[in-house]
Amino acid sequence: MARRPYRQLFETLILNVLDNVIPMNVEAIRRGVSEKLGREVSWNTIKKYLESLRDDGSVEEIHTGKLLLYKRK
């Protein structure tokens, strides 16, 4: 049996962690995904898949001063 591609795994986990109302930063999303996955996930990995989800239109990017937040659309 083939394993699920990492892209599909991480995008599903990120969408499960994100909220429709409350925006979250990359570190908060990383902690949530790490908790659900049961192992530490790199900040760069989360950022990579967040940018992919943003480009697909599943996630909205919010700029608040120096902070970059994300929420589900």
Question: What is the predicted role of each segment?
Answer:
Residues 54-64:
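A short, conserved structural fragment
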Residues 23-33:
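Short acidic, hydrophobic short linear motifs in intrinsically disordered regions
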Residues 47-51:
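Short, hydrophobic-biased segments on the C-terminal half of alpha helices
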Residues 31-41:
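Short helix-coil junctions and helix-kink-helix linkers
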Residues 44:
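Key DNA-contact positions within bacterial/archaeal DNA-binding proteins
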Residues 7-8, 63-73:
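Short, cationic-aromatic polyanion-contact patches
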Residues 1-23:
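Short alpha-helical segments that sit at the start of domains
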